[in-house]
């Protein structure tokens, strides 16, 4: 891609290699999740001389006036498409954020609202007053419970309110449906954002957009940190001018796989209704999981290591830098842990039982390949458990015809190795493996793929050298907070320190200097 862009720009500029290299580098940066490229003064001067390639855009430049393939805004270089996405998100969010109802929201004094903490009551009021709102908080802080109260309040005031629930993945949508139902919300099941928008069979356009907005009055999106800039722009285009939008997520989790850091940027934007829940009921504030998560976010590797080495029973640690082998078989207690933790799942005699036990335990890895990656660990677990047990399989591509989404997990039973069994409203359903686009074993998954999931216990594996660019604050925080019970960390002090000191940084222009 970089070479193709370089060649195109050289043709457009009559062989200007400096301009071609700058533009090609900007495109290459997109692969790292950046929306744009930050320029130095010399680069700005060079690009100012090629208006047919690079359009200099001001804050008021109409998007339709830009024809050049690249855009400079301030000291940032965009592809035209990315500039249009970001401009659209900024304008739509800004306009919606200014639409705030006057007066106070008085919640009824009944049992449905009485158990709300003060921070939750304030959040419900903010959501009910603002056309656009954000709710962020860690696991167990009551985000779903709070949203449910806001929904009830507005539906009581307007019984005809058309509500839609959505999430970036099928797995997250299923969890959202269950959580909202448990919290007392009566609504249609949550769908993936792509399904809500009506992705066309070309996979690049949607049925719903500016010319055909969604017939809803309020959209609530869970796991919003997983939404990239292009999808957020398309989502906003599909909302009519009066539609409410509430984004729910954990700002400390991993950013989207797609380019951008939209949820994180919006959580720092001035003028936006943002509520953050801090009190967790899942993890005691002085408990090991909460202490580690807080220390990771606080860039305090010494505190993380102190908790890990205390070996409380909730948290345990194996120092991979002191093992003699890179193979999992040589890691202290690893094989025994896998046999024990996967034991109940391995003994499942039918698909329903296996699916009920599939989230009892999961191995989470920062890497996909290599001795500390998902591929090697899945191979190892399959070998030690043997051929006679069920195998968890993850779907890795969306398929509308089969109604499956990237990230969905099912099981293959040993007596029926050609079918994948998946959870359904009525229990289970099965699909022949050859009818699915792509699958992979899921005893171990990447931490990225674990977003939106929770497990009774997890083991986290980090490469011990501490130099991988994937070792970030967000990767370790996300992995740790997937558990409802305990964590066993296979890592090293170097890899823990690398995670604590490095936060994900993506170059975007959504937050202006004055925002």
Go through the PLM ranges and name each one.
Residues 1-43:
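Intrinsically disordered, low-complexity N-terminal extensions of AAA+/P-loop NTPases
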Residues 43-104:
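Interdomain "pre-motor" coupling segment immediately N-terminal to P-loop NTPase/helicase cores
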Residues 103-120:
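N-terminal pre-Walker A segment at the start of P-loop NTPase domains
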Residues 121-124, 128-312:
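ASCE P-loop NTPase helicase motor core
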Residues 252-393, 399-402, 413:
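Conserved helicase motor core of P-loop NTPases
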Residues 263, 457-515:
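Helicase C-terminal subdomain and adjacent C-terminal extension
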Residues 400-408, 420, 467-471:
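Short, Lys/Arg- and Gly-enriched loop/turn segments at beta-strand edges
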Residues 401-408, 446-456, 479:
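SF2 helicase motor core recognition
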């Amino acid at each position: 891609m970089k070479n193709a862009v370089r060649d195109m720009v050289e043709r457009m500029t009559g062989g200007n290699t400096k301009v071609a290299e700058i533009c090609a580098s900007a495109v290459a940066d997109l692969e790292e999740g950046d929306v744009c490229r930050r320029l130095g003064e010399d680069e700005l001067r060079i690009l100012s001389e090629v208006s047919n390639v690079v359009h200099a855009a001001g804050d008021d430049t109409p998007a339709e006036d830009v024809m050049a393939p690249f855009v400079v805004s301030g000291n940032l270089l965009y592809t035209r498409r990315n500039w249009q996405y970001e401009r659209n998100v900024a304008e739509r969010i800004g306009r919606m954020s200014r639409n705030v109802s006057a007066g106070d929201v008085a919640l009824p004094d009944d049992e449905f609202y009485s158990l709300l903490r003060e921070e939750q009551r304030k959040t419900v009021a903010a959501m009910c007053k603002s056309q656009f709102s954000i709710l962020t908080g860690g696991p167990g802080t009551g985000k779903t419970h709070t949203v449910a109260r806001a929904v009830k309040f507005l539906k009581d005031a307007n019984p005809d309110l058309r509500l839609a629930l959505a999430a970036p993945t099928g797995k997250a949508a299923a969890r959202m449906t269950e959580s909202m139902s448990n919290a007392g919300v009566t609504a249609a099941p949550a769908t993936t954002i792509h399904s809500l928008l009506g992705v066309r069979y070309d996979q690049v356009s949607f049925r719903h957009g500016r010319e055909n907005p969604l017939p809803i009055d309020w959209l609530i999106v869970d796991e919003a940190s997983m939404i990239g800039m292009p999808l957020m722009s398309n989502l906003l285009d599909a909302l009519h001018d009066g539609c409410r939008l509430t984004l729910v997520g954990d700002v400390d989790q991993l950013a989207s796989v797609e380019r951008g850091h939209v949820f994180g940027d919006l959580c720092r934007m001035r003028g936006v209704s943002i509520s953050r829940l801090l009190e967790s009921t899942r993890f005691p504030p002085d408990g090991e999981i909460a202490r580690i998560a807080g220390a990771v976010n606080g860039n305090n590797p010494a505190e993380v290591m102190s908790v890990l080495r205390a070996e409380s029973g909730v948290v345990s640690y194996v120092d991979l830098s002191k093992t003699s082998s890179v193979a999992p078989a040589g890691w202290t207690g690893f094989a025994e842990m896998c046999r024990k933790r996967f034991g109940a799942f391995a003994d499942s005699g039918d698909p329903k039982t296996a699916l009920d036990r599939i989230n009892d335990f999961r191995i989470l890895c920062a890497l996909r390949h290599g001795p500390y990656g998902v591929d090697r660990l899945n191979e190892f677990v399959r070998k030690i458990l043997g051929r006679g047990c069920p195998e968890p399989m993850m779907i890795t591509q969306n398929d509308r015809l089969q109604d499956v989404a990237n990230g969905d997990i099912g099981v293959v039973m040993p007596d029926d190795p050609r079918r994948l069994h998946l959870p359904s409203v009525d229990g289970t359903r099965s699909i022949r493996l050859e009818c699915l686009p792509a699958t992979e074993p899921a005893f171990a998954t990447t931490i990225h793929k674990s977003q939106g999931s929770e497990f009774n216990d997890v083991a986290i594996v980090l490469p011990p050298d501490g130099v991988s660019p994937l070792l970030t604050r967000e990767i370790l925080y996300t992995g740790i907070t997937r558990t409802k019970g305990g964590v066993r960390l296979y890592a090293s002090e170097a890899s823990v320190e690398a995670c604590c000191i490095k936060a994900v940084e993506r170059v975007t222009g959504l937050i202006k200097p004055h925002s």
